Amino acid sequence: MASWLQIPKNSPFSLANIPFGIISSSKLSSRVPAIAIGDYALDLSKFASSGGFSQLPVIQPHLNVFNQSTLNAFAALGRPVHRQVREYIQKVFSTETPFPQILRDNAALQKEALLPLSEVTNHLPMQIGDYTDFYAGLNHAYNVGVLFRGPDNALQPNYKHLPVAYHGRASSVVTSGTPLHRPQGQILTNPAANPKLPTFSPCKKLDIELELAFFVSTPNDLGHPVHIDKAEDHIFGVVLMNDWSARDIQAWEYVPLGPFNAKNFGTTITPWVVLIDALEPFRTVGLEPGNRESLLPYLREKRADTAYDIPLEVEVTNAGGEPTVISHSNAKNLLYSFPQMLAHHTITGCNLNTGDLLGSGTISGKENQTEGSFLEQTNGKNPIKLADGSERLFLEDGDTVILRGMAGTEGNYVGFGDCAGTILPPVQLDL
């Protein structure tokens, strides 16, 4: 796809993408919806109020969605509308645009609505009512299971029959670039001791989890599950996600009800939501086909290619140091698809709402340096060497982690942008 707007060939926001987000700037009096294209954000509030959507009848009754401070109202319009809006914007920016008067030849509107990304502030794209994190990364689940239970019992008996998940904390989901303080809590420093007595301490095993996550668009009613064949139409779009994890706090607290404080202190997502339609060209078979016979019928999809071939990477930079890419993985390293996660979540009659966030689970490969967490790479014993010669078993204060994901070819990349966060020292407590 070629555009009249100059777009860097390595941009994750090519004309093939058109992700949606929420921005503010010194030019704007409030937060507004926008799309990212190349090095620019298109202010959809200004674009809509200036006749930008005049050639798209389907959105005319709903132009007020572009005056909201979140994308929830737009997401609730449903996938057919999202698709038409995205395709329309692609036509507006294409070299052979059928609507040159809208923006290409409209210098005044370009000046008003096209803002350099370097001059805008990104915000959470959605008001998130609930957040659920799945555990669909089979390789990660196996690797961690081996560490704790050995290879013979690495996976629980239910793992290949249902997408395991836990309910996370929506209030501490933050957008890329938000720093997080090192968490503090109860830690068992001597697991062999009897009796087992915890101490209160800053986390000493602070970790990351490389994930994708998706937002719910249209809700389902309480008591009415979403059929697997219709589940994808309830998905608005996808973001990169870092599920920060305090492994030592987790080890002491997680039996019998799972993680709590170990994961509730911060979850970072990318600010630009990549619509599910933009990922369609990258469909592939995941770790197992989506239509495999071993699944119960409510989870069995009609097609095999229910995953996405999206290269992912993890970069770590220590304070004042050089960046080091410590891992390369791929989004296809998942056992369950997004529709399967959504169908399973609702099978009991649970109602999902517009803006709910559902994480994939940690996406790890099978080889060394394809793991999506420090726990898998180091096991707390085998340090990762950074570019400046320093070593890491887990994250230290001042470390910055950036997750990236981008599919496609030069000039037509579909990516998420950076999912970045820096670790600050723990807050001083008066205990």
Swiss-Prot record:
What upregulates this protein? By phenylacetate (PhoAc), 2OH-PhoAc, 3OH-PhoAc, 4OH-PhoAc, phenylalanine, and tyrosine. Not induced by acetate or glutamate. Expression is partially repressed by glucose.
The UniProt keywords, alphabetically, are: Calcium, Hydrolase, Magnesium, Metal-binding, Phenylalanine catabolism, Tyrosine catabolism
Presence of keyword Hydrolase: yes
This protein's record includes keyword Magnesium: yes
What's the superkingdom here? Eukaryota
User: Which residues are substrate-binding?
Assistant: Y135, R149, Q250, Y254, T362
EC number(s) on file: 3.7.1.2
Give a short account of what the protein does: Use of phenylalanine and phenylacetate as a carbon source.
Entry protein name: Fumarylacetoacetase
